[in-house]
């Protein structure tokens, strides 16, 4: 009897294969500890979330209606909060669509309102007039608009802003989103960096200076269609893969899987840690961050300064020094390398506003320094602080601070009651 012929399995047609399996993405930057939201500073467009009658707070104030918040981010003139169940709330300026929701009812932008998203969100980021949300399966939704020096350039399509969330088209699941003033950085599961938005200062890391102004001949698509930042790996045939990425106002920092720090964007006050002050349009391996004894774990950039931290919980600053924004004491001058902020306890996170700096200590206190004009320091005064000052206030009593985020004129704290910790 002849042997039975085993029928060869026909491979399914290409389009029948699901493009990407449903994955649950995770990254160490995703926050899970729930808390309450406090805001302070200037709130003339509703970015404090305290209603139409409160346009300024010199001390942290509790934002009503928000509970179990795991992430609170300050954009330029708006605030975005993510709660434990993956829902997004926003408040503040909605002129360009940064809130992602209808605010036609007068005053509705001044209090927290829900952004309609069907998916569970695990991370949010906010820029000057845009907001991004990362879902648990690695998709990114975006709303608002990006601007350059001449005005609006669009969001995902030239000159078109979006008042509601739209999905960013990418083939690869994203694990982290980070926003500069007018650019977005997405880190994928594969360790690739995709960037979009304004590229004038080099912050996209993939658009040469020649085309940085509105994309050259290719037009705005060159800037607004997310593309990968390609960087050849020395000594091997592949490309550099990244484990983390952070944004300043006009710059981007990325940490490779080997632990090297790369940066691109504006460095007119050495805020990238470059020896010169030229903008960097392609990723630079930043030798000023090379030190065999420590690894860098956090970066935050203001308008012209950077605050960063190492794995030992020490905070450093570099860049422009005016108004005390480096936290290095009275009379400190501009720094081109990370310089230790010695008057701080062990820190768990750092943050920047436009001209201010913050550090949250391991024991849950928050320290602030820099320009006092907008009451963002929580001292109750409008004087500048050249060294870190511990923030105090009624709403901080018997509470620990989880995180801090700061925008152009306002600051947002995530706190929880001491009993729970």
Curated annotation (Swiss-Prot):
RCC1 repeats lie at residues 34-84, 85-136, 138-189, 191-257, 258-311, 312-362, 363-416. Gene3D superfamilies: Regulator of chromosome condensation 1/beta-lactamase-inhibitor protein II. GO terms for molecular function: guanyl-nucleotide exchange factor activity; nucleosomal DNA binding. It is found in: Nucleus; Chromosome; Cytoplasm. Residues 1-31 are annotated as: Disordered. This is Regulator of chromosome condensation. The keyword Flavoprotein does not apply. The modification N-methylproline is found at residue 2. The modification Phosphoserine is found at residue 11. N-terminal methylation by METTL11A/NTM1 is required for binding double-stranded DNA and stable chromatin association. Dimethylation produces a permanent positive charge on the amino group, which facilitates electrostatic binding to the phosphate groups on DNA, while inhibiting histone-binding. Methylated tail helps retain RCC1 on chromosomes during nucleotide exchange on Ran. SUPFAM superfamilies: RCC1/BLIP-II. Residues 1-10, 19-30 have a biased composition (Basic residues). The gene is RCC1. Interacts with RAN. Interacts with KPNA3. Interacts (via N-terminus and RCC1 repeats) with KPNA4. Interacts with ARRB2; the interaction is detected in the nucleus upon OR1D2 stimulation. The modification N,N-dimethylproline is found at residue 2. A motif (Bipartite nuclear localization signal) lies at residues 4-24. GO terms for biological process: cell division; chromosome segregation; spindle assembly. Keywords: Cell cycle, Cell division, Chromosome, Cytoplasm, DNA-binding, Guanine-nucleotide releasing factor, Methylation, Mitosis, Nucleus, Phosphoprotein, Repeat. Guanine-nucleotide releasing factor that promotes the exchange of Ran-bound GDP by GTP, and thereby plays an important role in RAN-mediated functions in nuclear import and mitosis. Contributes to the generation of high levels of chromosome-associated, GTP-bound RAN, which is important for mitotic spindle assembly and normal progress through mitosis. Via its role in maintaining high levels of GTP-bound RAN in the nucleus, contributes to the release of cargo proteins from importins after nuclear import. Involved in the regulation of onset of chromosome condensation in the S phase. GO terms for cellular component: chromosome; cytoplasm; nucleus. Its main location: nucleus.
């Amino acid at each position: 009897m002849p042997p039975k012929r085993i029928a060869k399995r026909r491979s399914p047609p290409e389009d029948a294969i699901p493009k990407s399996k449903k994955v649950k993405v995770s990254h160490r930057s995703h926050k899970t500890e729930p808390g309450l939201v406090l805001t302070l500073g200037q709130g003339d467009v509703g970015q404090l979330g305290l209603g139409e009658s409160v346009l300024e707070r010199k001390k942290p104030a509790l934002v009503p209606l928000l509970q179990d918040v795991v992430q609170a981010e300050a954009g330029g003139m708006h605030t975005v909060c993510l709660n434990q169940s993956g829902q997004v709330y926003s408040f503040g300026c909605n002129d360009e669509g940064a809130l992602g929701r209808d605010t036609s009812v007068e005053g509705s932008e001044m209090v927290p309102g829900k952004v309609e998203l069907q998916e569970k969100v695990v991370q949010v980021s906010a820029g000057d007039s845009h907001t991004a949300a990362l879902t648990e399966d690695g998709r990114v939704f975006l709303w608002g608009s990006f601007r350059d020096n001449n005005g609006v350039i669009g969001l995902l399509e030239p000159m078109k802003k979006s008042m509601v969330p739209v999905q960013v088209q990418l083939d690869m699941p994203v694990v982290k989103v980070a926003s500069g003033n007018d650019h977005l950085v997405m880190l994928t599961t594969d360790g690739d960096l995709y960037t979009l938005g304004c590229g004038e200062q080099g912050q996209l890391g993939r658009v040469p200076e020649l085309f940085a102004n509105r994309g050259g001949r290719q037009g705005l698509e060159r800037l607004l269609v997310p593309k990968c930042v390609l960087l050849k790996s020395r000594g091997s045939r592949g490309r550099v893969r990244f484990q983390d990425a952070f944004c300043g106002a006009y710059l981007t920092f990325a940490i490779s899987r080997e632990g090297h720090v790369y940066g691109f964007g504006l460095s007119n006050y050495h805020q990238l840690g470059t020896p010169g002050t030229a903008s960097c349009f392609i990723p630079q391996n930043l030798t000023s961050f090379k030190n065999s004894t420590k690894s860098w774990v956090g970066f935050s950039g203001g308008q012209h300064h950077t605050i960063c931290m190492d794995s030992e919980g020490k905070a450093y600053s570099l860049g422009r020094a005016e108004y005390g924004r480096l936290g290095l004491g009275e009379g400190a001058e501009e720094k081109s390398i990370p310089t230790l902020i010695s008057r701080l306890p062990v820190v768990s996170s750092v943050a920047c506003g436009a001209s201010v700096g913050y550090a949250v200590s391991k024991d849950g206190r928050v320290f602030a320094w820099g320009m006092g004009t907008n009451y963002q320091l929580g001292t109750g005064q409008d004087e500048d602080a050249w060294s870190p000052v511990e923030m105090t206030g009624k709403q901080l009593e018997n509470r620990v601070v989880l995180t801090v985020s700061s925008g152009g004129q306002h600051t947002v704290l995530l706190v929880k009651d001491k009993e729970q910790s």
